[in-house]
From Swiss-Prot:
Residues 33-50 have a biased composition (Basic and acidic residues). Transmembrane segments: none annotated. One of its GO terms (biological process) is rRNA base methylation. GO terms for cellular component: cytoplasm. This is Ribosomal RNA large subunit methyltransferase F.
Amino acid sequence: MSKPAVKSVPSATAKTATRAVNIRQKVKAPKQAKPEAKGRAKPSKDKPRAEIKKALHPRNAHLNGYDFPALYAAFTQLKTFVRPTPYGTLSIDFADPLAVKTLNAALLKHHYGIGAWDIPQGALCPPIPGRVDYVHYVADLLAEGDKSCAMDKARVLDIGTGANGIYPILGCQVYGWQYVASDINAHSLTNVQSIIEQNPVLQGRISLRLQPDDKAVFKGVIQAEERFELTLCNPPFHASMAEASEGTKRKVNNLQLNRGSSVKAAPKLNFGGQAAELWCQGGERQFLATMIRESQMFADQCLWFTSLVSKQENLKPCYQALAQLNVDTVKTIEMQQGNKITRVLAWSFQSAAKRKIWRAEHLAN
């Protein structure tokens, strides 16, 4: 199957551009765009302003929902799970893990040219529209409105790629990025390697690395003299398996309420996830603290560090930790996909001038 055309990133507009923020600015979404804040981040009790995205990214292929006839035409197995809704539309039962996994396989084949994709039972099944949103927004972050930025020359590090390998797959197929994908679970990496081997379009573009230390993030993965334009991460949410199980129960209850159903959902929904994908000691807050601390060790090797932040209350300690480091720019992008709100936290030790030089040296057409 031919590789999808690599997308270029247009100049940022007032609607889509993320905005650099000084750590001393206060949090609240602005009613209208304000000038870019300049200067080096300094210690402060205040937090950067988050720019809110109430819909999917304008370049997101799933902006207008799922075209089920096109999807099951590309991936016939999906048709078994598609059914009409009371609203005259088509959908699947999102409480059925096999239906959700099959939808993902169809989306990856139809939109991204991935002919074979599968995950082990119990592994995290990612919502592709939200995952590719993250990819699009960090592409904007990298380009900073520079039309000459050659996306297919970018090297990207995915921390905790899991068994699904979704960020390397999407980044490779949408922007032509070269990836290093790491994980502490060797079985997860084995599954991603199987996906790569079954899809020639991914071969030679994704390198897998086992993180030998489950308490480290970048140490043990980033090698000496290695350069990355971006790092991505979807951290473990919870601090224990019990907390993760409780979170799953809440999601099940919310799904039942949204469906208006009093019928018990199946015990295993698409809110799956192996232990390392769902929880770690100290939870998301501690994971992010370790990531921020270790990022300083690789300040000159990575242009932008980024991570999803699922819990609003975890932003403040992140801002405080970044304020104590020699961080030049901190950005926060708040994204909304359906009822779910998540955030991309991004920081760079390089000034705007140095980032421009970096792009000219490594990402020029």
